[in-house]
Amino acid sequence: MTIDSGAGISVWPRDLINDGRPTESTAESLLGIGYAPAGAQSALIKDEGKRKYHLVDRFGQQTSINPRIAGVRKPLVAVADLNDRGFDVIFPATLRRTPAYAKHTADNTTLTFDRRNQVYEYVVNVQPFTGNDRQVAP
């Protein structure tokens, strides 16, 4: 997932994971609201609702995400969404060997990001959908 400081919302491609996970309607999807994409594309990207994903990174850190679902090419995590969930997001300019990360202000949960091809990515495994979405992670 690309960590995007310019994204207004976190969004995932509709066909990224087809495991029976439900897509929940949102006010925006019900109203047919679309989002302006970055770049030269002029057509709005329609909000199709949201899904919940439970994630585990390579360090064993668990979290969850509720991205909007849309006709996008790759998953984006908005820095603003991380901030709204209580994470401070750090992209160090010094000590280039220090990874970028997001640290939760209440419980110190830390999500570590990799810099690849000039962008920051959060490398995770998506946990299989079990039909039970009650588990809540920071």
Regions found by a protein language model. Name each.
Residues 9, 27-50, 75, 111-114, ...:
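Pepsin-like aspartyl protease folds
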Residues 54-138:
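Aspartic protease core domain of the pepsin/retropepsin superfamily
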Residues 1, 41-43, 79, 89:
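Beta-strand elements of modular eukaryotic interaction domains
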